[in-house]
């Protein structure tokens, strides 16, 4: 994937996430399109560019997030590193495997974020956390299949 294409994909997905995705919430949970873009870049772009895109996408999401500042910047970069390492070790040749990887990463992002919030003294109810973690990861994985279809990734 060319550099400008990866940047454009992440930018378009971020704009969609901040504007239109609010209208397709399921149980007040919406997919993380920016994370889909970061993982797609980590899967298909060269290593340095994918890491830079992960860092920039995390910083972009942090500017509009109400969470602790910097959490997405750090974790999007780390997810990019892990996906780059995983693509060397595992066969991620079909969209089902990629969607499963995205679902797992979104679930881990929710778990790590909750642990950080608990450490910072910000309580998150268990029911809200479970709904966000389970439904959010499944919803994001399903939406990633649609994103791959639109991008014509096979």
What are these regions (language model features)?
Residues 1-154:
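Terminal, non-globular segments
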